[in-house]
Curated annotation (Swiss-Prot):
InterPro entries the UniProt entry points to: MATE_fam (IPR002528), MATE_MdtK (IPR050222), MdtK-like (IPR048279), Multidrug-R_MdtK (IPR022913)
Function: Multidrug efflux pump that functions probably as a Na(+)/drug antiporter.
Localization (cell): Cell inner membrane
Native organism taxonomy: Bacteria, Pseudomonadati, Pseudomonadota, Gammaproteobacteria, Enterobacterales
Family assignment from sequence similarity: Belongs to the multi antimicrobial extrusion (MATE) (TC 2.A.66.1) family. MdtK subfamily.
Name of the molecule in the record: Multidrug resistance protein MdtK
Annotated Gene Ontology cellular component terms: plasma membrane
Organism, scientific name: Salmonella enteritidis PT4 (strain P125109)
A Pfam short name: MatE
Chief location bin: membrane
Keywords: Antiport, Cell inner membrane, Cell membrane, Ion transport, Membrane, Sodium, Sodium transport, Transmembrane, Transmembrane helix, Transport
Bilayer topology: Multi-pass membrane protein
Gene label: mdtK
Length: 457
């Protein structure tokens, strides 16, 4: 029991800064929406539309680079720290290549925006302008993620938290300057949010790079050889590990976007109730997602040390802590669901629907916690292909079709409306949780030599 208690302390010490960093990131999006809304409703809508395209594109790159964390954690655990700098260099090369692709996609996103049904031309122009300003921040964001993954792979999660809050503090005044046109800058409205956010990502990257260069604990792994050429073997391995994570993230984000589109014709009350429940559950998702990042670090580190039993302990502890957190947040959601809904909207119909959906969200949180921590465990074991196949099957083969059937057809029961999609979420996430656990069990039952050989690749 003592080893689980000790492991839980170490996991929480890693996870809490990640949680706070994620809060800062979420707050940046909230600040952009509020400040753009203060300028005009059209500008706020433009930021919302632009963000809905930015997120799938940038999260694809973000997911690709997540491969660095278990690689660095494993090298750190095995005492091969001299190889970390080379892995990080290749991470920067990969981030550079991916950022070019992301920028090309975002530059041409105007075709998607202008093809939206009945979109106002002025709104479309502002959304395109917002994206074309924001895309210059894509390299800064991805380079920052490489530096952050280096720190987190070395079990240092506090720098990411500090840089997250630095970004938030810089974002507010820079937003103000470019939205309203102060200090000789042009008045850009919602487009100014894109300029500010792009600038903030570069500030966060430069600050993180400065920390890495001056941190005593990283003296032995600094890049003293210059940038060097791309190493095709290392980059291929990072892509093999990262691509399944990137695709899983992409399909998860697009699933919720597709459901939002399918709910939109059902009416304002249904859309608002669905959005409130989804927004609140996404805030709660920060907890297990951050814990999953900590579990990846601990499992990778323990495998690097050559201890498959300690890696199992880290995995089981992460699941136990995650389930406890999910039960607490589920009870909180059920108990205060009406009060939470009233914080978003005071329309009685919207509040009633949101409160009903939050009952389903409480169940969803438990399944979601297990599946996301399961994904973190599999990343630690460098078993990333299974993450993609499990999430794709669970979300797109099981979750979305069953949600569609329950919500919009009479095939099984009378049309359930938004609640049907939430039942689909529960089916999809519960399936993912079960499949992740089965895969984890299969991996852990393999001989130690095979597990360690896979981890050392």
């Amino acid at each position: 029991m003592q080893k689980y208690t000790s492991e839980a302390r170490q996991l929480l010490a890693l996870a809490i800064p990640v949680i706070l960093a994620q809060v800062a990131q979420t707050a940046m999006g909230f600040v952009d929406t509020v400040m753009a809304g203060g300028y005009s409703a059209t500008d706020m809508a433009a930021v919302a539309i632009g963000t809905s395209i930015w997120l799938p594109a940038i999260l694809f790159g973000h997911g690709l680079l997540l491969a660095l964390t278990p690689v660095i954690a494993q090298l750190n655990g095995s005492g091969r720290r001299e190889r970390i700098a080379h892995q990080v260099r290749q991470g920067f090369w990969l981030a550079g290549f991916v950022s070019v692709l992301v920028m090309i996609v975002l530059w041409n996103a105007g075709y998607i925006i202008r093809s939206m049904h009945n979109i106002d031309p002025a709104l479309a122009d502002k959304a395109v302008g917002y994206l074309r300003a924001l895309l210059w921040g894509a390299p800064g964001y991805l380079f920052f993620q490489v530096a952050r993954n280096q720190c987190e792979g070395l079990a240092k999660t506090k720098p990411g938290m500090v840089m997250g809050f630095l970004g938030l503090l810089v974002n507010i005044p820079v937003n103000y300057i470019f939205i309203y046109g102060h200090f000789g800058m042009p008045e850009l409205g919602g487009i100014g949010c894109g300029v500010a956010t792009a600038a903030v990502y570069w500030v966060m990257f430069i600050a993180m790079l400065s920390y890495i260069k001056h941190a005593r604990s990283m003296r032995d792994i600094r890049n003293e050889k210059g940038f060097g050429k791309p190493d095709s073997i290392v980059m291929k391995r990072l892509i093999q590990l990262g691509l399944p994570i990137a695709l899983a993230l992409f399909f998860e984000v697009t699933l919720f976007a597709v459901v939002a589109l399918l709910v939109s014709p059902l009416g304002i009350v249904d859309v608002a109730g669905h959005q409130i429940a989804l927004n609140f559950s996404s805030l709660m998702f920060v907890l297990p997602m951050s814990l999953a990042a900590a579990v990846t670090i601990r499992v990778g580190y323990r495998l690097g040390q050559g201890s498959t039993l300690d890696a199992q302990t880290a995995a089981r502890t992460g699941l136990g802590v995650g389930i406890c957190m999910a039960v607490v947040t589920a009870i909180f959601t059920v108990t205060l669901r009406k009060h939470i809904a009233l914080l978003y909207n005071d329309n009685p119909e919207v509040v009633a629907l949101a409160a009903q959906l939050m009952l389903l969200a409480a169940v969803y949180q438990i399944s979601d916690s297990i599946q996301v921590i399961g994904s973190g465990i599999l990343r630690g074991y460098k078993d990333t292909r299974s993450i993609f196949f499990i999430t794709f099957t669970a979300y797109w083969v099981l979750g979305l079709p069953s949600g569609y059937i329950l919500a919009l057809t009479d095939l099984v029961v009378d049309r359930m409306g938004p609640a049907g999609f939430w039942m689909g979420f529960i089916i999809g996430l519960t399936s993912a949780a079960v499949l992740m656990m089965l895969r984890m069990r299969y991996l852990q039952r393999q001989p130690s030599a095979i597990i360690l050989q896979r981890a050392a690749r």
